Structures are given as structure tokens and as C-alpha cells.
């Protein structure tokens, strides 16, 4: 499984990139707005830091507008993947963009049927929202399992990006469920490193070493 960062914050991306294990970045209009910068400016800075898929989302909700925005964004850099919302016009746009060789990421997916439609349209990625489903009393991880089974049954090439990851346990769960990618906030990435016994072990090793030197 691969790890993407779900952020538009350049400092977080720089820190994540320094690990050498981050394979891509996902953004959305909310994350871009939080940075108070132009979408294209932010995206171009991100592609200079991470050599992998960088998801940038369209703002238009109509078919023509989505295709137009997608064409403009895709011309900025080969690594840019266009995030398209899971709607009727969105799926139409994905089908068109797929035929043009433009990579797409269908976002705001909350059901296996939606993921099936995205794959049939030729989406490069599909993003089921695990945490948001959990918030409404549904099982977000089970949705990943359902999508994985369907995709394997019919040999779909669409990759599953587990999105709306709230904590490290989600990462473990979606990895076991078969997600191709987990896109995580920087906070969750840092939490994945932590375990009290790791800290205790390091402290003991250092204490023993210092005692020996005396």
C-alpha cells in the first residue's frame, strides 16, 4: 500500500517528502482555501516536491465546466490528477477525460455502487470517505472491502484511495481491507510513528549506554 498526504500546506509536504516514503498528495478546495493561495500556484509548488500523483479538484459542477477546468489543470504538469465529484455530470466528465488520457480521481464516494460507476467510466482513482461514513454510523472500512472485491471480480484497474482518514487505526484497517493507497493528514502521519513502548525502549537503551560509560 502507498501513503499519500492529504494537505495543501507546503511545509507539511516538505516534511513528509523528506521521509522518502510519500507517493502522492491529495488536495481539495477546502484545503486550498485554508492556505489562502491560488490553486495553480499551490499545485505547481507541490509537484516540485513530490514525484507522484497530485490531486487537484475542479470547482465547476456542470459537465462542460469540469472538462474545461480539467484540461487546464492537466496541462500544468503530467503528475496532476483531476479530482471530480461523484455526480451524474462528474461521471460523464470522467469518461470523457479518460478517453483523452487525463488522469482522474473520483471523490466523495460513499457506496460500492458509486465506486463501480467510477471504474466503469475509467477513473484512475476512486476515493471512498472512510471517516465521514463512520461519523454517520456506517462502516467506512467495510466499504473499502466491498469495493476491493468488486474491482478484483471484474479486473478493474481503478485504484482505491482510502480518504477521510482520522487516526492511525484507520490506516491499519484500510491496509488490511485492501486499499491501494491511504491519503492521510500530516497529523495522522506523525501519529503513525508513535508508540509508548518504542519511546520506553529508546530511553532504556540510552540509559544503559550512559551507565556503561560511567
UniProtKB/Swiss-Prot annotation:
Record key words, sorted: Cytoplasm, Pentose shunt, Schiff base, Transferase
* Family affiliation: Belongs to the transaldolase family. Type 3B subfamily.
Kindly list the places in or outside the cell where this protein is found, as annotated in its UniProt entry. Cytoplasm
Kindly indicate whether the keyword Metal-binding belongs to this entry: no
Q: Which residues are annotated as active site? A: 83
Decide whether keyword Transferase is in the record.
yes
Annotated catalysed reactions: D-sedoheptulose 7-phosphate + D-glyceraldehyde 3-phosphate = D-erythrose 4-phosphate + beta-D-fructose 6-phosphate
Q: Name one GO biological process term.
A: pentose-phosphate shunt
Q: Which Pfam families match?
A: TAL_FSA
Q: What is its EC number?
A: 2.2.1.2
Q: Per the record, GO CC terms?
A: cytoplasm
- Primary location: cytoplasm
Please give the name of this protein: Probable transaldolase
* Single GO MF annotation: aldehyde-lyase activity
Q: What's this chain's function?
A: Transaldolase is important for the balance of metabolites in the pentose-phosphate pathway.
User: What pathway or pathways are given for this protein in its record?
Assistant: Carbohydrate degradation; pentose phosphate pathway; D-glyceraldehyde 3-phosphate and beta-D-fructose 6-phosphate from D-ribose 5-phosphate and D-xylulose 5-phosphate (non-oxidative stage): step 2/3
Amino acid at each position: 500500500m502507498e501513503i499519500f498526504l492529504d494537505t495543501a500546506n507546503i511545509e507539511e509536504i516538505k516534511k513528509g517528502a523528506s521521509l522518502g516514503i510519500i507517493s502522492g498528495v491529495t488536495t481539495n478546495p477546502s484545503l486550498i482555501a485554508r492556505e489562502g493561495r491560488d490553486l495553480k500556484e499551490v499545485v505547481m509548488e507541490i509537484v516540485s516536491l513530490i514525484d507522484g500523483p497530485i490531486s487537484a479538484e475542479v470547482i465547476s459542477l456542470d459537465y462542460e465546466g469540469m472538462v474545461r477546468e480539467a484540461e487546464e489543470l492537466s496541462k500544468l504538469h503530467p503528475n496532476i490528477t483531476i479530482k471530480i465529484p461523484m455526480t451524474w455530470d462528474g461521471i460523464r466528465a470522467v469518461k470523457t477525460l479518460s478517453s483523452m488520457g487525463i488522469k482522474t480521481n473520483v471523490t466523495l464516494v460513499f457506496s460500492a455502487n458509486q465506486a463501480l460507476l467510477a471504474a466503469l467510466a475509467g477513473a484512475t482513482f476512486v476515493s471512498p470517505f472512510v471517516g465521514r461514513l463512520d461519523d454517520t454510523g456506517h462502516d467506512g472500512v467495510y466499504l473499502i472491502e466491498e469495493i476491493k472485491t468488486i474491482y478484483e471480480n471484474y479486473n478493474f484497474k481503478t485504484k482505491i484511495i482510502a480518504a477521510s482518514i482520522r487516526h492511525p487505526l484507520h490506516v491499519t484497517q484500510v491496509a488490511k481491507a485492501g486499499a491501494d493507497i491511504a491519503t492521510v493528514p500530516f497529523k495522522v502521519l506523525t501519529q503513525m510513528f508513535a508508540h509508548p513502548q518504542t519511546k520506553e525502549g529508546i530511553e532504556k537503551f540510552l540509559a544503559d549506554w550512559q551507565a556503561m560509560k560511567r
